[in-house]
Amino acid sequence: MTLLPDPLQPVLLATVRLAGPYQAQPAETELYAAISRRHTNRLPFSDRRVPPAVRAELAEAAKVEGAILHMLDHDEAVRVLRLVRDAEREQLADPAYRAELARWAGGARDRDGIPDTALGPRAVDAGAPVRDFTAGRPGPRGYAWFEKDPQLAVLSVPAGDRASWLRAGQALQRVLLTATARGIAASPLTQPLETADAWLVRDPRSGHEQPQMILRIGYGLPVPPTPRRPVSQVLN
């Protein structure tokens, strides 16, 4: 696979060429088996901590793809969650944003968007570490207590160019599949990364990396898959 193979075709992001027979390595087979089991989990997680060995494995998965995964300590997680809530509050004040959420989230869906079954409950204490896709609209979500000390990680890349963005996507895939293979649930938090103040999410100890994704990780109950378009509609 070659990223950005033709400077004259900026929308051509990658080319993939078929080669001869290939014997997959055990680690690759494990990740492949996790594809159908990987789902975003917006349910409350338990307070059980992800073991250091698994956290290191997730960080290594990002490194393989040229990215960096910072596991946040308690104070950093509190700071980043505050950024998430501030950004979401700002976004929900925008009628266009609320209209977009209404188009893509909630209700019964068979191929696009996020159905009610995948939205997760509301937090009893109004501090859920998940995005509110309903923008406060009433619905059949119910309420639940979320984990007291959410475990967060920030996926970053060294630069802000297009090749780095693509590598971030590859790294995110490998991190999520590795997490799934280890029984770890995950859900993304991107609100502050969608604002002009995305740089505030950076690790203050380094300060130069480009954050691309905030992940909430932990142990949770299994969730059903969300609908997808048929292959015939997305692949010629």
Regions found by a protein language model. Give the residues of each.
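Acidic, surface-exposed loops and disordered segments
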Residues: 1-236
